[in-house]
């Protein structure tokens, strides 16, 4: 999530005196607590101005470099704490998992994500626990990922054939990768091809780009006039209507299928959710509404964008490090020698490629600031008091670049994971790009499988060059931050077919 600040509006300065009157009663209690250290807080705005000019994970890293691995901030009306060490991240995400299991509410989560529905934004409680169970046992279970492998392979072959048709020309991989990921998701979701998939992709991209998830309005929640003055809620309402129409069509089409069209083994993701809505699922102790279903479906689409971003970062780093690229490519070509397509059943042979993915996730996590938590009660972290209601960020980008944890932390070196058990499953606090604890991302296996398939196909079937004689060290690695961290400028590469594929 990104913080976006704009103080140029005259309305903001007009409201300053009223904001001060609202905030003043909160100051006395905080002064008696042992809060973490942090920068000086200015009246009303707190530390908001100090966040301008840098991407949020970099701005917060700069603060924790000065004040220590736990840092207290005042962001408008909100109390916030940032932790930037593996040890403190473990305290927040694991040791005190229940205390920090809630999410803060934002305009984006309220308006676009169906009043904080879906697993990502839901408040911690019975509804969240039900969704977590549904994800684990049905939607993204190991069984479903395995059953999707044949279709993944088929879509991967189509993906490769399309790239083959453009051999010798610079191409942007990211759009083709998204098309593959959405085709796989729709097959898992409805058992077939979706009408106009590009409309869903564009809607997800637009929401991601607009998910500067905490804006000025979010930092002053008591000032209900701010959203109207900024006009951002109008933008969100228009986007919500577009998303709503798309998802209503998807659900309606699925409901029209004949009752005997699918057997138990052919039940797809949307079928599972519709069954729960109708009260016939074994977990249906809490009513599931159409809005809940739409929130879950759309958050799965948004997750595809994170997988696509990780694939692009991994290719970028391998192109910048030719020795790593060759080592990974040699391994893939040995594993699939003599075959004309990539098979999911052989992915277990790719030990080095798995290290490449770990290293890409260490250096370029999908969400450099893990989705924020909200303290449900007062709690002590690192010897400091975190008051109830405080928003807590784990700056995983800082953990992934911590020189006390990683030798040559800014160097892309997959070998650092050789002969270690460190994995991104949430049990090793030094590598938590998907989070940890009760709110860990439920789609780790699904995402990792798609990443391995995509990178294997790109390395196996093609050699790759940079366009116009660009040198590896000249590759632009600038970031853009929306709902996650992506390349600011898409990676352009020139494919050369080596091992043709037939779809």
Swiss-Prot record:
SUPFAM superfamilies named among the record's database cross-references: Cytochrome P450 (SSF48264)
UniProt membrane topology term: Single-pass membrane protein
Pathway participation: Alkaloid biosynthesis
Residue intervals passing through the bilayer: 7-27
Recorded catalytic activity of this chain's protein: (19E)-geissoschizine + reduced [NADPH--hemoprotein reductase] + O2 = akuammicine + formate + oxidized [NADPH--hemoprotein reductase] + H2O + H(+); (19E)-geissoschizine + reduced [NADPH--hemoprotein reductase] + O2 = 3,17-didehydrostemmadenine + oxidized [NADPH--hemoprotein reductase] + 2 H2O; 3,17-didehydrostemmadenine = 17-dehydropreakuammicine
Biological process terms in GO annotation: alkaloid biosynthetic process
EC number(s) on file: 1.14.19.80
A cellular component annotation (GO) from this entry: membrane
Listed CDD domains: CYP71-like
One GO molecular-function entry: monooxygenase activity
Positions annotated to bind heme: 441
Keywords, comma-separated and alphabetical: Heme, Iron, Membrane, Metal-binding, Monooxygenase, Oxidoreductase, Transmembrane, Transmembrane helix
Keyword Iron part of the UniProt annotation: yes
Entry annotated with the keyword Transmembrane helix: yes
Subcellular localization: Membrane
InterPro entries linked to this entry: Cyt_P450, Cyt_P450_CS, Cyt_P450_E_grp-I, Cyt_P450_sf
A Pfam family annotated for this UniProt entry: p450
Domain of life: Eukaryota
Main location: membrane
Family the UniProt entry places it in: Belongs to the cytochrome P450 family.
Function recorded in the entry: Monooxygenase involved in the biosynthesis of curare monoterpene indole alkaloids (MIAs), natural products such as diaboline, a pharmacologically active compound used to regulate blood pressure. Curare alkaloids act as animal glycine receptor antagonists. Catalyzes the conversion of geissoschizine to dehydropreakuammicine by cyclization, which is spontaneously converted into akuammicine by aromatization.
Protein name: Geissoschizine oxidase
């Amino acid at each position: 999530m990104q913080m976006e600040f704009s103080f140029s509006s005259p309305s903001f300065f007009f409201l300053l005196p009223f904001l001060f009157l609202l905030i003043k009663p909160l100051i006395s209690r905080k002064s008696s607590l042992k809060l973490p250290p942090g920068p000086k807080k200015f009246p009303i705005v707190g530390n908001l101005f100090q966040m301008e000019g840098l991407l949020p994970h970099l701005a917060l890293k700069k603060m924790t470099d000065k004040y220590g691995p736990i840092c207290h901030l005042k962001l408008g009306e909100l109390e916030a704490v940032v932790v930037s060490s593996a040890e403190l991240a473990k305290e927040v995400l694991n040791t005190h998992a229940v205390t920090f299991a809630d999410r803060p509410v934002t305009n984006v989560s309220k308006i676009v994500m169906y009043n904080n529905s879906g697993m990502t934004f839901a408040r911690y409680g019975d509804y969240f626990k039900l969704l977590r169970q549904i994800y684990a046992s049905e939607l993204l279970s190991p069984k479903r990922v395995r059953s999707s492998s044949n279709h993944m392979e088929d879509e991967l072959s189509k993906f490769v054939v399309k790239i083959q048709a453009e051999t010798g020309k610079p191409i942007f991989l990211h759009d083709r990768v998204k098309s593959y990921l959405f085709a796989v998701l729709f097959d898992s979701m409805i058992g077939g091809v979706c009408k106009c998939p590009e409309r869903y992709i564009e809607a997800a991209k637009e929401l991601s780009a607009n998910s500067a998830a905490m804006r000025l309005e979010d930092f002053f929640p008591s000032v209900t006039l701010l959203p109207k003055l900024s006009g951002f809620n109008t933008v969100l309402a228009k986007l919500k209507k577009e998303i709503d129409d798309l998802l209503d069509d998807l659900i309606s089409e699925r409901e029209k299928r004949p009752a005997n069209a699918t057997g138990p083994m052919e039940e797809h993701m949307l079928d599972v959710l519709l069954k729960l809505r109708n009260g016939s699922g074994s977990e249906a102790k809490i009513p599931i509404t159409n809005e809940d279903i739409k929130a879950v479906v759309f958050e799965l689409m948004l997750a595809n964008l994170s997988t696509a971003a990780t694939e692009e970062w991994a290719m970028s780093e391998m192109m910048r490090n030719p020795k790593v690229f060759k080592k990974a490519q040699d391994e893939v070509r040995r594993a699939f020698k003599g075959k004309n397509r990539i098979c999911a059943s052989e992915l277990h042979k790719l030990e080095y490629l798995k290290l490449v993915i770990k290293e890409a996730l260490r250096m370029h996590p999908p969400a450099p600031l893990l989705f924020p938590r909200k303290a449900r009660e007062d709690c002590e972290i690192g010897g400091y008091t975190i008051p109830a209601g405080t928003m807590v960020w784990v700056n995983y980008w800082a953990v992934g670049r911590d020189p006390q944890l990683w030798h040559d932390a800014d160097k892309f070196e997959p070998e650092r994971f050789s002969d270690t058990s460190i994995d991104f499953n949430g049990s090793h606090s030094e590598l938590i790009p998907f989070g940890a604890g009760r709110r860990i991302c439920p789609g780790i296996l699904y995402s990792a499988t798609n990443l391995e398939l995509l990178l294997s196909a790109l390395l196996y079937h093609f050699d790759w060059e940079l366009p116009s004689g660009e040198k590896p060290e000249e590759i632009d690695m600038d970031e853009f931050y929306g709902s996650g961290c992506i390349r600011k400028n898409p990676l352009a590469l020139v494919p050369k077919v080596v091992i043709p594929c037939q779809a």
